A protein has these predicted regions:
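Ser/Thr-centric signal marking residues that sit
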Residues: 70, 106, 119
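Beta-strand->loop->alpha-helix junctions that form or flank phosphate-binding loops
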Residues: 73-78, 97-106
Length: 195
């Protein structure tokens, strides 16, 4: 009986596993723990500083950890922040299929944490410099999940999202069995009506 159950569990499933494809932006968060946000012109010393890869990376990392094939179709730059991003993607088994910018580094966010709230200061980089062709490399297969983050809808990369949705058809009766999901955050309130 045990061998029979083991045989059933070890059979390969004929249904292909879905791939998670993120069209989201990835950047580096530099977390700085401080006692208090300084007044304009003031000064603060960070008690702890920790760089980590952020943005859509966390969604991809979670998908990869549960065993889904995971791909990042966003733009990555060239420089120290981009190197940190590429290492994190590689370490987590996430394939980068998107464009590479050799003329700009990826961006970063300073995250000032005073234990009551977080204050963000962003500098955008290569991840925000897409265009209408940015996601031409993305061809979702049957059952694939496409992740779209609100941040990608806030800059030039939005035209790439628009072109992708028109190319792959947003009508589920003609699109097939792939799925698209948008990340719901407060950034959605900043998204313009059209790219």
């Amino acid at each position: 009986m045990l061998n029979s159950l083991k045989g059933l569990l070890s059979r390969k499933n004929d249904v292909p596993s879905p791939t998670v494809i993120s069209l989201g932006q990835v950047w580096v968060d530099i977390m700085m723990d401080i006692d208090a946000i300084p007044q304009p012109g003031g000064f603060a010393v960070a008690n702890h500083t920790m760089p980590s890869v952020g943005g859509s990376f966390r969604v991809m990392q979670a998908a990869s950890r549960i065993g889904a094939a995971t791909k990042h179709a966003g733009v990555i730059g060239n420089g120290p922040w981009a190197s940190l991003i590429r290492k994190a993607l590689n370490d987590n088994g996430i394939e980068h299929i998107g464009q590479d910018r050799i003329d700009a580094d990826s961006g970063f966010r300073l995250v000032l944490n005073d234990s009551e709230r977080k204050t963000f200061v962003a500098t955008y980089g290569a991840e925000s410099q897409g265009n209408e062709n940015t996601f031409d490399c993305v061809e979702p297969g049957e059952g694939d999940v496409v992740h779209i983050s609100a941040n990608t809808l806030m800059d030039h990369s939005a035209s790439g999202i628009d072109a992708f949705l028109h190319r792959t058809s947003s009508d589920p009766t003609t699109r097939g069995d792939d799925s698209a999901g948008a990340c719901s955050t407060t950034a959605c309130t900043l998204v313009p009506d059209r790219p």
